[in-house]
Amino acid sequence: MTHDWCHRHAGSLRIAVHVQPGARVSEVVGESGDALKIRLQAPPVDGKANEALIVFISEKLGVRQRDVRLLRGQTSRQKLLEIESGLSVEEVRARLL
């Protein structure tokens, strides 16, 4: 089954994620439909979960935090991230799954 939660768009990468804030530990759970499912320790208060997501993704992918941007979903569990990186879609999938 092919999921398109990660794709190239105009020279950058876009990743669709489904976030579960307030978890015991931050981790990638797997694929959920057309999104990557991620549990985060941070609570969904005052943008803390969004900040934690950017830190988590940047560490997993080995990119700078400023290269990860939240495009959509500031107040939703469904989010779209844009990553400025030379990584391929296959490399991103390998590092996150």
Predicted feature locations:
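Contiguous, often N-terminal, cationic amphipathic patches that form binding interfaces
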Residues: 1-55, 63-65, 69-74, 79-97
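Alpha-helical residues within the helix-turn-helix
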Residues: 59
